[in-house]
Swiss-Prot record:
Gene3D superfamilies with a match to the protein in the record: Antimicrobial Peptide, Beta-defensin 2, Chain A (3.10.360.10)
Family: Belongs to the beta-defensin family. LAP/TAP subfamily.
Tissue note: Expressed in lung epithelial cells (at protein level). Expressed in foreskin, lung and trachea. Lower expression in kidney, uterus and salivary gland tissue. Expressed in epithelial cells of the respiratory tract, with higher expression in distal parenchyma of the lung, trachea, and tonsils, and lower expression in pharynx and adenoid, and low expression in tongue and larynx.
Signal peptide (UniProt feature, chain positions): 1-23
Regulation: induction: Up-regulated by TNF, IL1B, Gram-negative and Gram-positive bacteria, C.albicans and bacterial lipopolysaccharides (LPS). Up-regulated by inflammation in skin keratinocytes in epidermal tissue.
Effect of R46A: No impact on fungal cell permeabilization. Impaired antifungal activity
Disulphide bridges: C31-C60, C38-C53, C43-C61
Annotated source species: Homo sapiens (Human)
Function: Exhibits antimicrobial activity against Gram-negative bacteria and Gram-positive bacteria, with highest activity against Gram-negative bacteria. Antimicrobial activity against P.aruginosa seems to be salt-sensitive and is reduced with high salt concentrations greater than 25 mM. Also exhibits antimicrobial activity against the yeast C.albicans. Permeabilizes C.albicans cell membranes via targeting plasma membrane lipid phosphatidylinositol 4,5-bisphosphate (PIP2), thereby leading to cell fragmentation and cell death. Acts as a ligand for C-C chemokine receptor CCR6.
Effect recorded for K48A: Loss of PIP2 binding and reduced liposomal lysis activity. Impaired antifungal activity. Decrease in fungal cell permeabilization
Gene: DEFB4A
Protein name as annotated: Defensin beta 4A
Family matches, as PANTHER family: BETA-DEFENSIN (PTHR20515), DEFENSIN BETA 4A (PTHR20515:SF2)
Domain of life the protein comes from: Eukaryota
Lineage of producing organism: Eukaryota, Metazoa, Chordata, Craniata, Vertebrata
Quaternary assembly: Monomer. Homodimer.
């Protein structure tokens, strides 16, 4: 029975996703912490999209 707990813990750690592997920014707090802005529809001129701000159509934009 103890072996099952050990097995489950190893599987959990092994299958846990790594940060940064599945894309960039996905919420407004992370966007603002990275020094970017949330902007609807498209990024302004001279800004580059680095993620989304959680809502559909809202982009996280940062100056390159």
């Amino acid at each position: 029975m103890r072996v099952l707990y050990l097995l489950f813990s190893f599987l959990f750690i092994f299958l846990m996703p790594l940060p940064g592997v599945f894309g960039g920014i996905g919420d407004p707090v992370t966007c603002l912490k990275s020094g970017a802005i949330c902007h609807p529809v498209f990024c302004p001129r001279r800004y580059k999209q680095i993620g989304t701000c959680g809502l559909p159509g809202t982009k996280c934009c940062k100056k390159p």
